[in-house]
């Protein structure tokens, strides 16, 4: 699982996913978030600029979750994710935020935006980091099962 973002939402989902047995690759431009993730024993990749993202290798078993509220990071990270094979691509935020995000992606010439889940999570409108993490992980598990059942058929 690849999770990009900053703050409590990033930390909560990364920790929960790790406990659930996922191999987590957390990406953040925020030094404080990076330090929190490292203290939790998570693999952290420090993002320095949205114009020079590290190479990725998302495969059909990878979920990519965006835990940002910043279009300067969202557009390049989602463009990159959409170029890969991740079975799930999702972004935190309200329906209004998702509409703004999709509009920004279209203006940037990004295709296949229908692959982006948003708002993320099985339980709508989660306001705390732990609840959002649980709701998001549940959605990822459901999507993984559905995706791989379709692939096997």
Predicted features by range, described:
Residues 10, 71-74, 98, 125:
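Alpha-helix N-cap/loop-to-helix initiation residues
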Residues 1-59, 73-77:
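Hydrophobic, well-ordered beta-alpha structural blocks that scaffold small-molecule cofactor pockets
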Residues 1-4, 10-23, 63, 130, ...:
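SAM-dependent methyltransferases
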Residues 22, 86, 110:
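Short phosphate-binding/catalytic loops that engage adenosine nucleotides
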Residues 92-153:
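Adenosine-phosphate binding glycine-rich loop
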